[in-house]
Amino acid sequence: MFEPVATARQRAVACCTFTTEQEDVVQWLVWALPALVIGLAIGAGIGILIYKNSVQSQIRQIEAEARLQLEATRSEQKDLILRATDEALRLRTEAEAQIREARAALAKQEERLQRKEENLDRKIEGLERRERQLQQRERQMEQLHQEAEHLRQQQRAELERISALSQEEARAIILKRVEDETRDEAARRIREIEKTMHEEADKLARKVISMAIQRCASDYVAEVTVSTVALPSEELKGRIIGREGRNIRAFEQLTGVDIIVDDTPEAVTLSCHDPVRREVARLALIKLLKDGRIHPTRIEEVVHKTQQEVDQVMREEGERVAYEANVQGLHPDLIKLLGRLKYRTSYGQNVLQHSLECALLAAHIAAEIGANINVAKTAALLHDIGKAVDHEVQGPHALIGAEIARRLGKSPAIVHAIAAHHNDEEPQTVEAWLVQAVDAISGGRPGARRETLDLYIKRLEALETVATSFSGVQRAFAVQAGREVRVMVQPDAIDDLGSIHLARDVAKKIEESLQYPGQIKVTVIRETRAVDYAR
């Protein structure tokens, strides 16, 4: 395979001639080259062997990883198959359950429909049976009607034969008899019903009103507007009049009040139809007398300041009364008009305190009977608001007050209750009747109001005159300060049932022709006396 080393050396020597150093190098190369070739061959073999071992190791590692991955894939595949199997089983179970529920619901629905159908069939059968019964009853009624008509014809002929009366004459007699019997029966029934109704109503009314009055418990003395101012001395009358009457003219012009200086010792009288202006004049005159400086400029200053003070007092009084009555949301103008009622009186009763008492009573009674409390107490508080301006506007104070309340935003129910509290409008609501009732209770209780002697006597005479204006009345007496009228009737002219009608007619005429506080009781007395003598 290789040539001998000596032969190669000889061939090299033959080819060229070298120096000694070159010969040494060549000789070294000759010896080193084979060794190098051998080393390279050995290294290449070792490298190939190492590379082969490395490749085989990697192949074994890759095969191991592939086997592990294959096993993991197979395990995951098994898990997926198991989960899919479980899910399919669950879905199948749920589907079967839903199918069973749907079948059960369908069966129940079919059962209900079956029952409804059976009930409907029974109802149809019942209706058909009832229809047959009605038809049979109609035939029976028709037969009875024919029999009755036949009997009526027979009776009519018999009556005409017996009484020798015509049909019209017999009908008139029968109708009159039936009318008399019906009237008497109706009067008896009315008396029984009224007796029962009055007993129950009086019992309930006493209970409700007593509870309301006890809870209200208003305690005050009726105020009277003072129009007389006391003077410390008679000399002040001349100072009030002033030089050539300039002081009194300035005072009357600024206040609109007439000052009456007469012979009354140490007093002057203030005269004016407006109680507010009269109060302003009274307070201003008292201040001028205390101050001592009385001249037109000072009078103008004091009157202006007093007007502001009275306006403030009216607002405060209106707010106080609204607060005590627990009525909220009133317009400022309504508050001021309420305050003006402080200076108004009705038969000696202060109108502002009367309105407050009515509001408290209305609230308590409305709570007892289930009426609208807010409407009742608000309408009761404002029911006399028209009296604050009724001298400035023409018309009944109830309608004036209702118009003011409507214009200032009160509800139609409140406006109607105010307008109807003196029957200027027909009461249509429970609250309207309630305001009438509390107005009568507050004004009609003993001591609340008073009348002059002349008015009192005239009212009693008017009551007796109304009662004696009816036929059959013998005498009439007004008793209990005009709160009851006792009517004595002629027993031959009016019977017991006629007494009921007479009492109602007298009460109705009193309501239509007279004005009075509270209510008036009408008692009709029919007395029959049988007298004989034993000899």
Curated annotation (Swiss-Prot):
Domain HD: from-to ranges: 351-444
One BP annotation, GO: mRNA catabolic process
Ranges where the KH domain occurs: 225-285
Signal peptide feature range: none
Keywords, ordered alphabetically: Cell membrane, Endonuclease, Hydrolase, Membrane, Nuclease, RNA-binding, Transmembrane, Transmembrane helix
InterPro entries referenced in this protein's UniProt entry, alphabetically: HD/PDEase_dom, HD_domain, HDIG_dom, KH_dom, KH_dom_type_1, KH_dom_type_1_sf, Ribonuclease_Y, RNase_Y_N
Localization annotation: Cell membrane
Gene3D superfamilies the record matches: Hypothetical protein af1432, K Homology domain, type 1
Transmembrane segments: 30-50
Keyword Lipid metabolism: no
Membrane-protein topology: Single-pass membrane protein
CDD domains for the chain: HDc, KH-I_RNaseY
EC number: 3.1.-.-
A GO molecular-function descriptor: RNA endonuclease activity
Keyword Nuclease set for record: yes
Pfam families per UniProt: HD (PF01966), KH_1 (PF00013), RNase_Y_N (PF12072)
Function as written in the Swiss-Prot or TrEMBL entry: Endoribonuclease that initiates mRNA decay.
The family this protein is said to belong to: Belongs to the RNase Y family.
HAMAP family in alphabetical order: RNase_Y
Protein name listed in UniProt: Ribonuclease Y
Organism whose genome encodes this protein: Roseiflexus castenholzii (strain DSM 13941 / HLO8)
Lineage: Bacteria, Bacillati, Chloroflexota, Chloroflexia, Chloroflexales
